[in-house]
C-alpha cells in the first residue's frame, strides 16, 4: 500500500467554497471546500477518504497510470485547486502518513524510526488520553505499543490498541471512501 495524506490551511478556499465546472455546460456550481477537494482527489485514485483534517489517498493501484510516485506527486501539486499550498506526506500506512503530515505542518522534525518514535499527539486515538499518558511518562507511539495489551485496553479502551495494531501492520486499515 502507498498512502498520500494532504492538508490545506483552514482558510485555503474561503468559507464559501470552490466553483466546480459542470459537465453539461451550465454555470459552475459552488460546493463546500472539503467536498470539492474530495472530488478533485478522485481523479488520482478511487480510494479517497477524509480522516480528521487530512485528505487521504491510497494510490498503490493507480501509480502506474501516473508513471510512478514522483510524477503523481508533481501532478497533485500542479493541479492543486485551492489557492493555498498543499502539505503532503507519504507512507506505507495511512495512519502514519497522517502523523507525518501533522509533524510537517507544525514544522517539527520527522523521526526516522517510524512508527515507534512518532509523538503521541499525532495519533488521533491517543488524543483523549494524552494527559494521563504523559503523566505515565509515555510520549511516543512505541512506548504505548510496548504496554501489555489487556491492561492497556482496560485503561484506555480498544480504540487506542486498534490504532497501534494498524500502525504496526497487525490489522488492516479501513476508511469510509468518498
Region annotations inferred by a language model:
Residues 1-178:
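Gly/Gly-Pro- and Ser/Thr-rich, intrinsically disordered tail segments characteristic of DNA damage-repair
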